[in-house]
Amino acid sequence: QHAPVVIVGHSLGANAALLVGYELGKQGIPVDLVVTVDPTSSRPISPVVKRYLNIYLPGDGFGAKLAATGSGVDNDDIRNNPELNRPGVNHFTMDENPVVLKQIFDAIMPIVKAPGQKGAAKGRKG
């Protein structure tokens, strides 16, 4: 069994997260979760990635909906969330917004916590 692989990025870093997930999939390395916050690109999408969480704001010149749909792709348009659809939440601030950070945390924690484990799994350095 492999250690969980979770990739998170914002803006151009989100584009890089998509690319890294895709390339790892091509190498046969399973990716548990790719989280993108307002990516400027909608692909590449890998069928090997178990889940994508894309939090985006379309129409601001940055945010893109991921090109794939299905049970493994969650496109979350923040205009549909009353806690986020408000002045001051934009491409440059959304990655620090507590609501967005909680979404990311809630997506990651079930992956990195083993059943019955009280704390998060320890990350590897390197």
Where are the regions that the model predicts?
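Serine-dependent carboxylesterase/thioesterase catalytic core
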Residues: 1-69
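Lipolytic serine-hydrolase domain surface
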Residues: 47-126
